[in-house]
Design a protein with these regions (language model features):
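Histidine/lysine/aspartate-rich catalytic loop segments that bind and position anionic ligands
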Residues: 1-48
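Active-site beta-loop-alpha junctions enriched in small/polar residues
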Residues: 2-4, 24-26, 54-55, 59-65, ...
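Catalytic cores of alpha/beta
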Residues: 3-14, 62-77
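Glycine-rich phosphate-binding active-site loops on the catalytic face of alpha/beta enzymes
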Residues: 18-30, 76-95
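Short, surface-exposed, polar/charged, turn-prone segments marking secondary-structure boundaries
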Residues: 26-27, 47-49, 84-87, 107-110
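C-terminal helical cap(s) of enzyme catalytic domains, especially alpha/beta-barrels
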Residues: 31, 35, 89-110
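Alpha-helix-loop-beta-strand connector modules within alpha/beta enzyme cores
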Residues: 35-58, 74, 102-108
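Short amphipathic alpha-helical interaction segments
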Residues: 37-41, 58-62, 72, 79, ...
Length: 110
């Protein structure tokens, strides 16, 4: 879902138990002048989702560089979907080392 706080209540009304925040806009804004504005949008959406009783997931274009800030700033993210970046990194560093590094990055951000 796009980071629109008002839509979290709508998602909850459908009977959903979780939402996945679509993070490509965050990834594009990462390390730019728009970064803090975008991070706050996601944080507000996550707070709204939690207030509506929803769990929060996130995914799309997350990677080892932009993931720590996202997890530190956006409350309650229970799960992230990182397919492309993880596999691309694994081709260079190996799957086991890459998974360990992502777990370290996520642990550092928690």
């Amino acid at each position: 879902m796009d980071p629109l706080p008002e839509m979290m209540v709508v998602a909850a009304a459908t009977g959903a138990q979780r939402v996945e925040l679509y993070t490509e806009p965050y990834a594009r804004a990462f390390a730019t002048a728009n970064e803090s504005t975008m991070v706050e949008r996601y944080a507000a959406a996550a707070r709204s989702a939690q207030a509506a009783g929803l769990g929060v997931n996130a995914g799309h274009d997350l990677n080892r560089d932009n993931l720590p800030l996202f997890l530190a700033a956006v409350p309650g993210v229970a799960e992230v979907s990182i397919g492309h970046a993880l596999i691309a990194d694994a081709l260079e560093w190996g799957l086991a080392a890459t998974v360990r590094d992502y777990l370290r990055v996520m642990g550092d951000a928690a």
